[in-house]
From Swiss-Prot:
One of its GO terms (cellular component) is extracellular space. One of its GO terms (biological process) is cellular response to heat. Gene3D superfamilies: 2.80.10.50. This is Interleukin-1 alpha. Residues 82-86 are annotated as: Nuclear localization signal (NLS). The modification N6-acetyllysine is found at residue 82. Glycans are attached at residues 102, 121, 137, 141. InterPro entries: IL-1_alpha, IL-1_CS, IL-1_fam, IL-1_propep, IL1/FGF.
């Protein structure tokens, strides 16, 4: 009787034969943190405690696939749980992660939690104030105003003197120069916008001066500022899937999108 090929053994042999190649591509190395660096929920009983994560692999010696092309997660019975093809010159980015998560042709392994610790654990250094005394309007032409000493809200107003005026301070990080982290301060005060969890109101917190360095738990004061035409978005650094948002008859909060409004128009020179 013909011997049934052991696919998992082939995978191990392929990796062993190409160990020297893997050392030249550290960002795909098994010595580095896994591309899927999250805690996964329980798999089917037949696969529990049997899955392995390979950063790079060939499927078998006879497959003729090049060593550089694939990234897979397989179980010991040879079932491919998740895969993504990459070239050696392709860096792993947030877009890679998002594309994999949204690809309907791939089997999704849902995590219990997937914190963006690589963002919140960075150190951010203050550069300078880049905008002074601007107003934020949402797409319903509501203006952000003070609800009380601690919270903000949005309302249709006729007198712009009621509007909150913000200053925007820019920060930088040596590890990621593709985003623009900013801090939002109520003009002529030392009150700073601070993020909480989803659907929780943003807070106004007082600090003696603008922080020169922000890291760890203090990243709730930072937001990635993105612009698309006249639309402006403020994405929480502490919660990178949540935006500053307005909601009907509610405080300004953090939200993923509708029914909350996450895009704003910046009105400058309103002093």
């Amino acid at each position: 009787m013909a011997k049934v090929p052991d696919m998992f053994e082939d995978l191990k042999n392929c990796y062993s034969e190409n160990e020297e190649v893997s050392s030249s591509i550290d960002h795909l190395s098994l010595n580095q943190k896994s591309f899927y660096d999250v805690s996964y929920g329980p798999l089917h009983e037949g696969c529990m405690d049997q899955s392995v994560s390979l950063s790079i692999s060939e499927i078998s010696k006879t497959s003729k696939l090049t060593f550089k092309q694939s990234m897979v997660v397989v179980s010991t019975n040879g079932k491919v749980l998740k895969k993504r093809r990459l070239s050696l010159s392709q860096s792993i980015t947030d877009n890679n992660l998002e594309a994999i998560a949204n690809d309907s042709e791939e089997e999704i392994i849902k995590p219990r939690s997937a914190p963006f610790s690589f963002l919140s654990n960075m150190t951010y250094h203050f550069i300078r104030i880049i905008k002074h005394e601007f107003i934020l309007n949402d797409t319903l032409n509501q203006t952000i105003i003070r609800a009380n000493d601690q919270y903000l809200t949005a309302a249709a107003i006729h007198n712009l003197d009621e509007a909150v005026k913000f200053d925007m301070g820019a920060y930088t990080s040596s590890k990621d120069d593709t985003k623009v982290p900013v801090i939002l301060r109520i003009s002529k005060t030392q009150l700073y916008v601070s993020a909480q969890d989803e659907d929780q109101p943003v807070l106004l917190k007082e600090m003696p001066e603008i922080p020169k360095t922000i890291t760890g738990s203090e990243t709730n004061f930072l937001f990635f500022w993105e612009t698309h035409g006249t639309k402006n978005y403020f994405i929480s650094v502490a919660h990178p899937n949540l935006f500053i948002a307005t909601k009907h008859d509610n405080w300004v909060c953090l939200a993923k999108g509708l029914p909350s409004i996450t895009d704003f128009q910046i009105l400058e020179n309103q002093a």
